[in-house]
Swiss-Prot record:
Belongs to the MinC family. The keyword Ribosomal protein does not apply. The gene is minC. This is Probable septum site-determining protein MinC. One of its GO terms (biological process) is regulation of cell septum assembly. Keywords: Cell cycle, Cell division, Septation. It comes from the Bacteria. Pfam families: MinC_C, MinC_N_1. It comes from Fusobacterium nucleatum subsp. nucleatum (strain ATCC 25586 / DSM 15643 / BCRC 10681 / CIP 101130 / JCM 8532 / KCTC 2640 / LMG 13131 / VPI 4355). Cell division inhibitor that blocks the formation of polar Z ring septums. Rapidly oscillates between the poles of the cell to destabilize FtsZ filaments that have formed before they mature into polar Z rings. Prevents FtsZ polymerization.
Length: 216
């Protein structure tokens, strides 16, 4: 049983290796047992979850995340996994390539907490969440691989070719070049409510206005 589900820590994430050759319901039972056994050791932690070894559908992934959150004090900030072939999304990044210039990219791993700020002369990529009252200012593009609840300024200096993108797109305010939009936040997105159906959204300037579109 111990070899069918293996849990180990890796930097900022919990890696869960799954046996691809046993029934998924057995995986669920074993994972629940192991999470309960490790609950006190893991404690109240905010971390990403990485599933490896087995391709998962959205439904299976959500089921496993539910088992983890229901049986531990883990707050899931992001999910890494291999998608089942039938569930793969064809995301066309070529449409963004003309907007990406060569230059410096600032990578930030973790949660940008309220009151914190990132400033960069190039692009910014956040591997985590951007909390309310936090700010990102970049001369290039800004990509958030998590929940965007803060304020983002891209294309500082008037570059209207820049873009802002996030998996969970809910900023307080965004500025691209010289254009700004506010009042676009309906609620604070909570990373404990994992919705794998959320679409990756991109804000860019079209016809002199900021437009937010789903990237599908």
């Amino acid at each position: 049983m111990s070899n069918h589900v293996i849990i180990k820590g890796k930097n900022d994430r919990l890696v869960i290796a799954l046996d691809p050759n046993i029934d998924f319901l057995d995986i669920c039972d074993i994972l629940k047992t192991k999470i309960l056994e490790a609950k006190d050791f893991i404690g109240n932690s905010r971390m990403a979850i990485e599933f490896s070894g087995r391709a998962l559908t959205n439904e299976e992934e959500n089921k496993l995340i539910g088992i983890i959150t229901d049986n531990s004090d883990i707050v899931v900030s992001y999910i890494f996994s291999k998608r089942a072939e039938s569930e793969e999304e064809n995301i066309d990044l070529n449409s963004l390539n003309p907007l990406i210039e060569e230059g410096k990219t600032h990578f930030f791993r973790g949660t940008l907490r309220s009151g914190s700020k990132i400033e960069s002369d190039g692009n910014v990529v956040v591997l985590g969440d951007v909390n309310p009252s936090s700010m990102i200012r970049a001369r290039g593009n800004v990509i958030v691989l998590g929940h965007l609840n803060g304020t983002v300024c891209a294309g500082l200096g008037g570059d209207d070719r820049a873009f802002i993108a996030a998996i969970y797109f809910n900023p307080i305010q965004i500025t691209i070049g010289m254009k700004t939009i506010t009042d676009i936040q309906d609620e604070i997105l909570d990373s404990t409510r994992v919705d794998k159906k959320s679409k990756f959204k991109v804000a860019s300037i079209k016809n002199q206005e900021i437009v937010v579109e789903e990237l599908i």
